[in-house]
Amino acid sequence: MSEFKRIPPEQALALRAQGAVVVDIRDPQAYAAGHIAGARHLDNHSVADFIRNADLDAPTLVVCYHGNSSQSAAAYLVGQGFSDVYSVDGGFELWRSTYPDETAQGTPE
């Protein structure tokens, strides 16, 4: 894949169930208040370590608030060598309203 794909929450849920990596690029306070269960918080400070330790061929889902900022972050990851990147349309807000039981709270790991 030479560029990322935009996908709806339903497809993201299926990919997540198959083991896709989920990264949340919202601010730490928003992440702590609620995020997709199993998502890793990613910001300017943690992205280098994430890239260094990542499987570049693993499906990677990028989530933001509403599905806009995640597109830029997904494009960045593709530029860093990731081959299977998805931006989740509607972001966490749509995910939370669609799958409230698939969310978690707490601070980044």
Swiss-Prot record:
Active-site residues per Swiss-Prot or TrEMBL entry: C64 (cysteine persulfide intermediate)
Domain Rhodanese as annotated: residue spans: 16-104
One Gene Ontology MF term: thiosulfate-cyanide sulfurtransferase activity
GO cellular component: cytoplasm
Gene3D superfamilies for this protein: Rhodanese-like domain (3.40.250.10)
Enzyme Commission code(s) on record: 2.8.1.1
The family this protein is said to belong to: Belongs to the GlpE family.
Protein name (record): Thiosulfate sulfurtransferase GlpE
